Amino acid sequence: MFKGTTIIAVRKGDKVSVAGDGQITFGENTILKHGAKKIRRLYNGEVIVGFAGSVADALTLSQKFEEKLEQYGGNLKRAAVELAQEWRKDKILRKLEALLIAVDKKDTLLISGTGEVIEPDEDVIGIGSGGNYAMAAALALRYNTDLDTEDIAKKALEIASKICVYTNNNITVETL
């Protein structure tokens, strides 16, 4: 399990939101930063990514993904698959300890530093140390309330921050 962050993506109707907390943890017991931004817009704002894991590895994965998005004209699935294929062939890159959630108007993908691309069955996906807590909260809110995606994502992270010591309530949300 990767420590130090929680990222959640929530899709409902024609909207999708990605939210992340701001905590960066060093080792087992030191908080280095409270207000880190782990959510980014790519490809002229048409794609949102959120990353979890080792900071350097997550940034490397995000940068490589951005290059593939540019190369394949913003095609999210194609960029993810091409990145995964490159990743699996490179012995050094395969060892990256990072996960990335990437969304556009149509698709939600989980991309791992080990070269896997997964399209979730549900309209909600969570990663990072508090990902399962946030995902459970978001699923409950998604299917049992009239909240929009941004509010669901934010509330899910607030709940996760009360359970997971590696997640804080300094939340960034981006919506398409």
UniProtKB/Swiss-Prot annotation:
Chief subcellular location: cytoplasm
Known regulation of activity: Allosterically activated by HslU binding.
Pfam families reported in the protein's UniProt record: Proteasome
Superkingdom to which the source organism belongs: Bacteria
Keywords for the protein's UniProt record, in alphabetical order: Allosteric enzyme, Cytoplasm, Hydrolase, Metal-binding, Protease, Sodium, Threonine protease
GO MF annotation, one: metal ion binding
Catalytic activity annotation: ATP-dependent cleavage of peptide bonds with broad specificity
InterPro entries: ATP-dep_Prtase_HsIV_su, Ntn_hydrolases_N, Proteasome_sua/b, Proteasome_suB-type
Keyword field contains Membrane: no
Subcellular location: Cytoplasm
Active site per UniProt: 5
Gene3D superfamilies: Glutamine Phosphoribosylpyrophosphate, subunit 1, domain 1
Binding site for Na(+): 161, 164, 167
Keyword Protease set for record: yes
Class of the enzyme per the UniProt entry, highest EC level: hydrolase
GO cellular component: HslUV protease complex; proteasome core complex
E.C. number: 3.4.25.2
Gene Ontology biological-process annotations: proteolysis involved in protein catabolic process
Family (UniProt): Belongs to the peptidase T1B family. HslV subfamily.
Subunit structure: A double ring-shaped homohexamer of HslV is capped on each side by a ring-shaped HslU homohexamer. The assembly of the HslU/HslV complex is dependent on binding of ATP.
Function: Protease subunit of a proteasome-like degradation complex believed to be a general protein degrading machinery.
HAMAP family: HslV
Protein name (record): ATP-dependent protease subunit HslV
